[in-house]
Amino acid sequence: MKRPNTGAKQLTSEKFSSNKAPLRHNVLVKNIEEVKGSTVCEACSIESNQAPQDMAYTPGKPFPTHHAQNASDYLNAALSAERWIATFEHKTPEGIFWQQDASQPIDLSLYSGSAGVAYFYLKLTEVTGNAEFAEKARCGLSYAAAHWRDLLLPEQAAFQDNREGVPGVHLGAHMGVGGVGLVLIEGAKTFTESKDAEKYRRAAQAIGRFYTDESAQQGESGPYWTGSPALLMDGGIMLFLIALYETFGDQQLLEFIKAAGAQYLRWSAESPRGGVDFNGAGIETPFDWPNFAFGSAGSGYLLAHLFRITGDARYLEVARRCADFLDAVAVPQKRGKLIPHKLGGDDEFTVFYLGYCHGIAGTLRFPTLMGTLDNDIRWATMVNQLADGAEALGAPEHMSAGLWNTVCYCCGHAGMAHTFLGLYCIDGSPRWREFATRCGDILLGSMKTHADGSASWPFAWERVHPEELSQRIGFYDGAAGIASTLLELFMLERDDYHWPRMIDDPFPEDPRR
């Protein structure tokens, strides 16, 4: 999801005990020696200079597909991915971290680093009930609890910020400190009867105090951090604080959130196109990213949560006006509409991402949440129009400018499948289930199986360089997130779907029957 520099201001489940794994899905995996390895083949290097022919990018080209014959096909693929991820595991006295490139700083983030991999192991444990997977999750969480401040070290902060081209992301909730906090919250809720739960709770609350007492700056109406409203930046920090408040309770924290919300509202701008715009790309940039990670879709989502926890109608009204802006910039397709990746510049209105970061897999979460708070048919209409627009571009089977040769959770099919499974949980529509399953066919079809039985996914990380493929392990950018989606599809096919969700994920945990 690498983007140009925005110029933003830079700042330095299922509950079970540690001794008893859940058997909700009755697929206890006892011997993971069959699905893990200690080496990785030479072909699994981080960067690949030449794309396999079936994953080379051509607009309109079909993605490789493989249709699952039964639910176990999804589980086996996820377990093969775990085997590959495990080859990058590093044990320390304080726990486990995962790292592909030893020449780079240790990546602790939810997005692409160890916190995201630990989150995958949480999900793998919930589904399989395997005690060794649970131990890996606990050890990964323990390392994150001990080392989250490492993300603030100059070398690590620069690594995160420069890789994404956005100063300040090391403070945010995806690539920074807040994302580690979100995973620690999930760990505390999952291992509720374990002595480790208290460790994770304390670390998550320490991250909360870092945001409230150390890194916050004072604006005209309240505190802020980076000065960008993007969910990747201040918006995501606020989502973490809301999750922290709702999980552990703290009236003083709620008052802080209210003050930060007042400051956040100051960043709204009346758009000449209509509605209200929150431009996370920065007010000095000549362009605007309107979707979930950086734009008004993500800001509207945060405002909906602020309305939900405070009852302050100002947030609901501005969220509605964010939707007005998105409606104003949406571009009609042969069917439905799509919101462009970017407003302004030579490619304005021409590229339509379909993933989480700048596309429907993320943006659909905004009308979904609003539909639970605001009794207006417009939210269901928005969901259907965006889904129609995606299919009009040939998704999920065909490549396009905004769905290039990528399948990861951030930009591709793993994120789309997750969102459409969430929509299926709301209304049980066969359409949503079928769309998710079609995405699953592509995840299986694009999987690269190695001689040792492990599996990875070669895909292009950067849209502007589709010839450069990599095989990554992270949650948003690699195998951990893809494998997590495969676990969801496994549960769906077994008619036993259950998925505890983070705060950026507004869908029900279970399908409504």
Regions found by a protein language model. Give the residues of each.
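Short polybasic linear motifs
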Residues: 21
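Glycan-recognition and catalytic cores of secretory/periplasmic carbohydrate-active enzymes
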Residues: 2-4, 9-11, 16, 24-513
